[in-house]
Design a protein with these regions (language model features):
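Noncatalytic, solvent-exposed loop/strand surfaces
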Residues: 1-328
Length: 328
């Protein structure tokens, strides 16, 4: 697996860090990586599909330490390899490994950011594909294979949990929990799970509502703009539609066109959508109706890598190309 640092304006490679992995996707898709790197305090933290966590120096790419969740925690590969992105909080790197360590639960593991040494392990659950998220400075919310967990960031102590998964074994939880204001969090998946809204209060997870037909996000995490939620509804195999819903659980609008899937980014009052067919779509985020401004074909079809946006530049890649587009 290779991690590269590039100049934003030219694409010039500043450094490259590579390690050898024998990971092969069980279903014949690309061999990763899946997880988005985390950057904090002069370090870059990566999590490879084979289970290796690596810390790199941000300026040079020099490897500082690595930790193998497969050997240390018996972290299983799952359907598509390890995919949750690292979370850096309180000087530690939180990984949804879904394993166990010397008889102890290790669904989550916290590694010291400076050394890679385990600080704590917790949660008796397998990993899904959603990434753990910070709730303030002291708590972590993690949607795993079987349950939604709220734990203490200091020691991994379980504060609260809720059962939340499909009845189908061949299912995935991929969309990361979305904060919706006032302590509310939206969690969504396909395979009959649908949309669930929870309130986190005093260290507890309180269910507010659940609707199976409102928004079932197969892969992409939805976004929130102006107190409205925008996301893809439906399975990738049968086609997805873009929907706008309210945090109260009503559908504001649904696009007529079906897509194979894609990812969403909110920038101000705009939505940037990259479809699996390699098309970039720019929309106004409005609850009245879908308001498509423009489309551009920027990549070849057949990819699922999440796009990124920073300082006016939109970044996207497929298996062969990385493109940077300045948006005005």
């Amino acid at each position: 697996m290779t991690t590269e640092a590039m100049e934003t304006t030219t694409g010039k490679v500043l450094w490259r860090s590579t390690y050898v992995t024998d990971y092969v996707d069980s279903f014949g898709f690309d061999n990763g990586p899946r997880a988005v790197p985390a950057v904090a305090d002069g370090r870059v933290f990566t999590y490879g599909p084979e289970g290796r966590v690596t810390a790199l120096d941000l300026n040079t790419g020099r490897e500082l330490w690595s930790y193998d969740t497969a050997s240390a925690l018996a972290s299983p590969q799952g359907f598509f390899g390890r995919a949750p992105s690292p979370l850096v909080q309180g000087g530690r790197v939180i990984i949804a490994a879904g394993g166990s360590r010397e008889g102890q639960d290790a669904g989550l593991v916290a590694l010291e950011a400076t050394t890679g040494k385990p600080a704590w392990t917790a949660v008796p659950d397998e990993a899904g594909y959603a990434s753990p998220v910070a709730v303030g400075d002291h708590q972590i919310l993690a949607w795993m294979r079987n349950r939604l967990w709220l734990v203490s960031a200091a020691d991994g102590r379980i504060l609260s949990s809720q059962p939340l998964r499909s009845r189908m074994d061949a299912s995935v939880n991929a969309a990361t929990p979305l904060p919706c204001g006032q302590g509310r969090w939206l969690v969504s998946a396909g395979y009959g799970v649908g949309a669930h809204l929870f309130r986190l209060e005093e260290g507890k997870i309180h269910p507010l509502w659940q609707r199976a037909d409102l928004l079932d996000c197969h892969y992409a995490t939805p976004v929130m703009v102006g107190w409205q939620i925008y996301g893809f509804h439906g399975r990738q195999e049968t086609g997805m539609t873009l929907r706008c819903i309210s945090p109260e659980g009503s559908i504001r609008w649904e696009a007529k066109e079906k897509l194979d899937g894609g990812t969403l980014i909110a920038v101000g009052s705009k939505l940037l959508i990259l479809t699996e067919d390699g098309e970039l779509r720019l929309l106004n985020a409005t609850p009245e109706a879908q308001d498509l401004i423009a489309t551009w074909q920027i990549l070849r079809a057949g990819h699922r890598s999440h796009a990124a946006y920073a300082s006016g530049i939109f970044y996207a890649r497929d298996s062969e190309h990385l493109v940077a587009i300045r948006l005005r």
